[in-house]
Amino acid sequence: MKRSSGILMAVSSLPSPYGIGTLGKAAYDFADFLKDAGQSYWQMLPLGPTSYGDSPYQSFSAYAGNPYYIDPDILAADGLLTAAECAAPDWGSDPRHVDYGKIYESRFTLLRKAYKRGWERDAEAIAAFAQDNARWLPDYALYMACKRHFGMKAWTEWPDDDLRLRKNEAVLDKYRTLLREDVQFFTYLQFLFFRQWTALRDYVHQQGIRIIGDLPIYVAMDSADVWAEPQFFQLDDDLVPKAVAGVPPDYFTADGQLWGNPLYDWDAMRDDGFGWWIRRIDGAGKLYDVIRIDHFRGFANYWAVPYGQPTAKNGRWIAGPGMDLIERLNGWFPQLEFIAEDLGYPTPEVAQLLRESGWPGMKVLEFAFDSRDSSGYLPHAYTPHCICYTGTHDNSPLALWRQEAAPEDVAHAVEYLALTEQEGFHWGIIRGGMSSVAELFVAQMQDYLGLGEGNRMNIPGTQGGNWTWRLLPGELSDALSVRIDRMTALYGRKA
């Protein structure tokens, strides 16, 4: 990875008249902005369909795209919708934040109109798309149709045990026939998503921009992935988890974090040649140029919490697949680059695995200025083979961090980076990352805009109000792109 820089910006955060960012004009405009600003990378959050809590890290599928991101204007230009139909629903009144409730109420109703007009018209192209994605699409479409049939209940709560347990092909065929219309509908939504995504990705590449995508290490229990292939997870005979994922107690959380995701049966995966992971990375490789593996430490060892425990306190560490998996992925995907999200308290096992993997790890500037202890996140401690971030989606924007952090930590940052009010606090922190030896520097869009309270993407461990932040129309000014471009060139990162 050559010396370069990029911007972290979720698709959901793009401006749009339809309540949430889409793969339409604003996405193309953002690619233009990145080019004008001298950037080389657009880092995104996961693109999958969101479920309870609206988190892109808890998706119904490791392969599918989020139907919310299908752009209505593109569908209208293609004759699948009318402008009046696109404008009719109430998409929410706050342009700064997504109202997921209103999106859920109206989006699928609108998209079903497009399906009614396009299913037969696009039959040949749909058939080709379905053939190319035969490994996951039929299970996903049936899973979503069944969820809708059973009132959006998790598959673990479906009343038909034969279907829940996938007893035989006959029961699956029964529901494919019973729910044929919905199976076709959810198939068509994926066809539309990937058609729009491919066009956008090609345009982004034409601008000289590469895409970094986030890959959550775990999949959601309520997902087509677990329902379709339960043999690769630590489940009992009734498909109830034996243990679930989380992290142990630490300085910040006395009870640890109980994520609740099912854990992988690494022995079963190893016996299968890690085929499940090869298929998953192959799917991600159709979306992204670089893949950031979230919670990389889970490949070294993972925290297993007995199912039913109210907190993560009573878990234990279990060895992960280590280099057996990583060597397999590196061998299968030489064209892809990986980033290891190795944040948290380092252990010798994780550090060794990172070195052996050859993947760059992460440095976060907001973690650098702890006045109580010397930090490996300070830029002078970097080696080039790393990725420097101002913060991730789980961090406050810099302007908000300045308000929340201990005064001594802010003072440490001011002294270390010679920050001044004339330059601007957030610009000085960005300068610290830009000037570092890290191969790649990435800043949140909120940080370039100097946004503070009310503009955080996610607060880990909380429910409600997360994943809603949006860019306002007009905030990507020419003056901003010029300033970013100048700093990018000054520190030798310009594309």
Feature roles, as predicted:
Residues 10, 54-194, 219-442, 446-453, ...:
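Alpha-amylase-like alpha-glycosidases and glucanotransferases acting on alpha-linked glucans and related
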Residues 186-219:
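Conserved, well-ordered alpha-helix/loop/beta-strand core segments that scaffold catalytic motifs
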Residues 42-46, 204, 210-216, 284-298:
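Short acidic catalytic loops
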Residues 1-82:
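Trp/Phe/Arg-rich N-terminal binding region typifying the photolyase-homology
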Residues 35, 197-205, 330, 354-355:
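Surface-exposed amphipathic alpha-helices with a cationic face
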